[in-house]
């Protein structure tokens, strides 16, 4: 195979079929249509996104789910394209890549995730993947709330029962119908990602928002209950520090240090 750099390869059409397994975890490519022409800047970004050198406790799949979740939270279409192209090149299923972006919606908001999804679909189209992908929805209008409460309770236990009992009447539409029905019913129930993977994705998404330490702490604890470790959470932050920046990364690390379950 021609010895392209990762940056060159991921700017080509059909990137996912050109990159071999030997390139797994290599650096992200700059958008070929970028207005930035700064090789030094690109070289630093390449170094910081070389996933084989980052996140030692995580699988390559987990690393890409973390990166996709952070991209979804930040809301930049070009970053969505690059994160998706890299994940495709490392063998992640198109549906799982899309799912990681979908999953961020109740946390980052659907305006941001829609923008990132546009970039994801650009990468998939370039790789010859037919869209739309197969539906992963498993709930209906009639059962989404019930199914959402079930998975929410599976993760958080009796906290959910107590919350439902103590939520004031004027907030029940928001805290039960929307939180349980939309966030958990519409998204957590979907096929493709495990609950542990979804909680890791949620942690990364909230960390990228910044200033949401109460929610970040709750989901850090949920990660531990689902079988993820503190090392997994710190390593996910290390994978994505190049896009998180240090202030949000260090704040998230402090949350992990304090969390128990």
Stretch-by-stretch model annotation:
Residues 2-4, 9-62, 78-85, 89, ...:
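Acidic, glycine/proline-rich low-complexity segments that act as flexible tails and inter-domain linkers
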Residues 99, 108-111:
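Substrate/cofactor-recognition hotspot
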Residues 53, 74-78, 92, 210, ...:
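Residues in soluble alpha-helical coiled-coils and helical-bundle/repeat scaffolds
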Residues 70-77, 108-109, 205-212, 245:
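Short alpha-helix boundary/capping elements
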Residues 62-71, 97-101, 197-207, 216, ...:
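Short, structured motif recognition centered on aromatic/hydrophobic residues
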Residues 88-100, 222-235, 240:
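Short, mixed-charge aromatic SLiMs
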Residues 194-203, 207-231:
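Glycine/small-residue-rich hydrophobic helix-like segments
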């Amino acid at each position: 195979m021609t010895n392209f750099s990762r940056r060159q390869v991921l700017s080509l059409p059909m990137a996912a079929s050109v990159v071999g397994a030997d390139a797994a975890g290599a650096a992200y490519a700059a958008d070929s249509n970028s207005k930035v022409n700064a090789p030094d800047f690109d070289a630093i970004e390449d170094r910081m996104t070389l996933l084989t050198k980052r996140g030692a406790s995580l699988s390559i799949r987990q690393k890409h789910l973390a990166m996709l979740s952070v991209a979804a939270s930040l809301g930049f279409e070009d970053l969505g394209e690059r994160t998706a192209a890299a994940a495709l090149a490392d063998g992640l299923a198109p549906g799982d890549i899309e799912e990681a972006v979908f999953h961020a919606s109740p946390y980052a908001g659907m305006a941001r995730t829609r923008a990132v999804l546009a970039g994801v679909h650009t990468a998939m189209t370039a790789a010859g993947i037919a869209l739309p992908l197969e539906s992963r929805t498993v709930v209906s209008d009639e059962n989404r709330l019930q199914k959402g409460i079930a998975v929410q309770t599976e993760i958080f236990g009796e906290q959910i029962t107590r919350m439902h009992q103590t939520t004031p009447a004027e907030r029940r539409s928001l805290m039960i119908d929307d939180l349980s029905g939309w966030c958990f019913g519409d998204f957590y129930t979907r096929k493709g990602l495990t609950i542990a993977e979804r909680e890791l994705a949620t942690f990364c998404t909230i960390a990228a928002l910044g200033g949401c330490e109460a929610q970040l702490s709750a989901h850090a604890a949920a990660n531990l209950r689902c079988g993820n470790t503190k090392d997994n959470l710190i390593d996910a932050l290390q994978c994505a520090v190049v896009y998180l920046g240090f202030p949000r990364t260090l704040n998230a690390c402090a949350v992990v240090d304090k969390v128990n379950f």
